[in-house]
């Protein structure tokens, strides 16, 4: 409730309009029975046509007023709930942009998607009901009780007796739905995760002819979700039929016990009709309140899941007031860096790493799988923070930089190229929105992407499917490199970014890259020796430690690990074509 209110209170004008229309709704709904009683007692029973017409026109006017009030209420609630969920999702997404890789790993991407969509929608539904009935219900209930007591105090006990039966139903449903709601959202997380993995890995599934197996697994996951949903629907479905039966029993009891007052004239027929209407509205208010109570457990679960996102401690401090500019550009130094992934401090993946890189230099990293190459370069843009030691960029500790300013200095090209839905031009301008067409042309030419771009009718306006799925792996990789070239950073980081390219394209691309990286620091993580032979310095990693450094020729003579890697590739084109 407090989480929802923190957003709704930002719009006092809409809340005031909502309150006004809710009060109008209550006045109309409780005014109609009173007018109906007057029509019966003053118009129908004495057969006074003039009074009947008078009260008829009054009723017609109030009904019109009620229609206007209902329209205003729906409009105000619609504005409040849609604006609330918009702001809520914007805040959640902004918070996610502050997350480091560690926070994403803690919660899981599929769960985050579920929370941004399904959980936010649950809160929107509850806010809709609360704004419509949260004000109407107490006003209606209090007003109905007062009218019941003033109309026929002797029959009021019947309504009072009905309330505990309703309360028991509400309590039972509320207690039972909370754990089921918690399980429901977790099950939905698993279902979304399974669907996401399978849709992403569709080609692998088909390649191994595992469609039937995956269908069975999905059906099993879906069955768990459906079973839990059925349990929830059965519980919440109890409320309305039980309430209806209790209300019917109450009306029958009122009519039965009203026979004597009607017979002795102490109660008029019109007043009896009005009393039944007031009693109906009193219990209907309780029904609305019950619906809010049955919705609340699931809303509380969704609210907690969203607050987890907002309250998650950020392991990477963005340092908004940090350094934004430096006199030099591209100087990089690792000073005795040790790194362990969060929660795994006993098992560091990097030990005592120290090296320097200057603008114009190319530093390469090579080693066996799991030696820490990618972990090392991910520390520079602070995807993770070092455990011990420090990393300096232009003489400043990366933790002392404004995080955005630090990342502006870096062009990071991951092994798995990620492109966004949109045009090729939009993707290339991702790091520099005002890049000219000439800059795009140059970057495409350098990255060896120009040929396949030119082969498409719309060239840079070619639309890319989700994740660039309408391109080959090599084409996506070249566009990823071109995107970094357009950005023109101080430090280029190629995290095994040439692996999807053939050897000839790899060699040509690296040769052309020198045209734009002459004043920048270039770091290359690679598996191919041929990719890094021309580097100014090659650093050999083994089990997170530096076990060798030097040029290709120096390492071939002095470092056994490097020599083994190189010799294993001697028969491949990686060395012969260089």
Annotate the PLM regions.
Residues 9-12, 77, 98-102, 118-131, ...:
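An intracellular "coupling" helix at the cytosolic face of ABC transporter transmembrane type-1 domains
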């Amino acid at each position: 409730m407090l989480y929802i209110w923190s957003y709704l209170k930002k719009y006092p004008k809409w809340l005031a309009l909502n309150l006004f229309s809710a009060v109008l709704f209550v006045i109309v709904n409780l005014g109609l029975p009173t007018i109906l009683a007057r029509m019966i007692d003053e118009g129908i029973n004495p057969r006074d046509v003039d009074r009947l017409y008078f009260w008829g026109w009054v009723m017609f006017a109030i009904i019109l007023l009620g229609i206007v009030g209902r329209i205003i209420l729906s409009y105000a609630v619609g504005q409040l709930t849609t604006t609330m969920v918009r702001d809520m999702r914007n805040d959640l997404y902004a918070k996610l942009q502050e997350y480091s890789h560690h926070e994403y790993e803690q919660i899981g991407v599929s769960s985050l998607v579920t929370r941004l969509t399904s959980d936010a929608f649950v809160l929107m539904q509850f806010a809709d009901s609360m704004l419509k009935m949260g004000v109407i219900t107490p006003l209606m209930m209090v007003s109905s009780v007062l009218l019941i007591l003033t109309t026929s105090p002797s029959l009021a006990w019947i309504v009072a007796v009905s309330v505990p039966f309703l309360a028991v139903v509400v309590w039972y449903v509320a207690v039972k739905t909370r754990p089921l709601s918690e399980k429901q959202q977790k099950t939905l997380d698993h279902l979304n995760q399974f669907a996401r993995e399978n849709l992403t890995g569709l080609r692998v599934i088909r390649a191994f002819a595992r469609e039937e197996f995956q269908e069975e697994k999905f059906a099993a996951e879906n069955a768990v979700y459906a079973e839990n949903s059925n349990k929830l629907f059965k519980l919440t479905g109890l409320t309305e039929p039980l309430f209806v039966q209790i209300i019917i029993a109450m009306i029958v009891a009122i009519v039965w016990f009203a026979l004597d007052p009607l017979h002795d004239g102490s109660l008029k027929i019109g007043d009896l009709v009005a009393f039944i209407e007031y009693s109906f509205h009193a219990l209907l208010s309780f029904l609305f309140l019950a619906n809010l109570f049955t919705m609340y457990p699931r809303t509380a679960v969704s609210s907690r899941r969203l607050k987890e996102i907002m309250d998650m401690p950020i392991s990477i401090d963005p340092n908004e007031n940090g350094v934004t500019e430096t006199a030099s550009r591209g100087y990089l130094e690792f000073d005795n860096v040790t790194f362990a992934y969060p929660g795994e401090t006993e098992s560091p993946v990097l030990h005592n790493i120290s090296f320097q890189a200057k603008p114009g230099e190319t530093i390469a990293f090579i080693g066996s799988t799991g030696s820490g190459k990618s972990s090392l370069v991910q520390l520079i843009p602070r995807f993770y923070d070092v455990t011990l030691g420090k990393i300096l960029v232009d003489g400043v500790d990366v933790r002392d930089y404004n995080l955005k300013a630090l990342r502006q200095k870096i062009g990071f090209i991951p092994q798995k190229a990620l492109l966004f839905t949109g045009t090729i031009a939009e993707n290339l301008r991702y790091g520099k929105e005002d890049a000219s067409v000439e800059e795009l042309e140059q970057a495409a030419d350098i990255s060896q992407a120009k040929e396949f771009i030119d082969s498409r009718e719309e060239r840079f306006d070619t639309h890319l499917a989700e994740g660039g799925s309408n391109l080959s792996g090599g084409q996506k990789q070249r566009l990823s490199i071109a995107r970094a070239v357009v950005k023109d950073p101080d430090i280029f980081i190629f995290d095994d970014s040439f692996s999807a390219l053939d050897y000839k394209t790899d060699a040509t691309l690296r040769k052309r890259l020198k045209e734009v990286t002459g004043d920048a620091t270039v770091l290359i993580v690679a598996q191919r020796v041929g990719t890094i032979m021309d580097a100014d310095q090659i650093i050999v990693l083994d089990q997170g430690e530096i076990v060798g450094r030097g040029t290709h020729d120096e390492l071939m003579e002095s470092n056994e690990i490097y020599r083994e890697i190189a010799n294993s590739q001697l028969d491949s084109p990686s060395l012969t074509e260089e």
